[in-house]
Design a protein with these regions (language model features):
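Short acidic, gly/pro-rich beta-turn/loop elements at beta-sheet edges
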Residues: 45-47, 84, 98
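A broad, low-specificity signal marking well-ordered, structured residues that form hydrophobic/aromatic
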Residues: 33, 72, 86, 113-115
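Generic preference for flexible, low-structure residues
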Residues: 51, 88-90, 102-106
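Catalytic "initiation/cleavage/transfer" segments centered on a nucleophilic residue
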Residues: 1-31, 94-141
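Signature for HUH/AEP ssDNA processing cores
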Residues: 18-79
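Histidine-centered divalent-metal-coordination microenvironment in nucleic-acid enzymes
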Residues: 72-94
Length: 141
């Protein structure tokens, strides 16, 4: 019998694979963008999953207007910190968009707005990039 953590991770992996299979089956090109979303260190507001759901709903609305057929999945993680953080995968129609840096700027602005903090606050979105490999994120499939 598998332990609960392994079963949980298998469920997440299967959900991600199902989403990727669905999206790539329905689009000639898929742009996948990975990022992590955090709360400010001294944040005293609500830290429920409603915040990330609202943020991603705004992201979807923005990219639907651009006809990029956005889809996403996120996973909440909370280790020893007071606040959870989220691992996110955002998918866009690769025939409609070629680059991904605008996604980081958008999610930064929308997350700050969701938390009702300064729009220009930085450091809450981890771009999941690798300095030695500029093509580490924003994979086109």
């Amino acid at each position: 019998m598998k332990n609960k953590n392994v079963q949980y991770l298998d469920n997440i992996k299967n959900s991600v694979n199902d989403l990727l299979d669905f999206y790539t089956d329905n689009h000639r090109k898929t742009l996948s963008i990975r990022f992590d979303v955090r709360y400010p260190q001294n944040y005293t507001g609500d830290t429920s999953s409603k915040n990330i759901s609202d943020c991603m709903a705004h992201m979807v609305k923005k990219y639907k207007r651009r006809k990029c057929d956005p889809y996403y999945i996120w996973v909440r993680e909370q280790n020893k910190s007071d606040h959870p953080h989220y691992h996110c995968l955002f998918l866009l129609d690769g025939t409609r968009v070629k680059t991904y840096n605008h996604v980081f700027k958008s999610v930064e602005t929308i997350w700050n707005s969701t938390l009702d903090i300064d729009r220009d606050s930085k450091g809450l979105i981890d771009y999941c990039t690798n300095k030695s490999n500029r093509d580490y994120n924003g994979k086109m499939v």
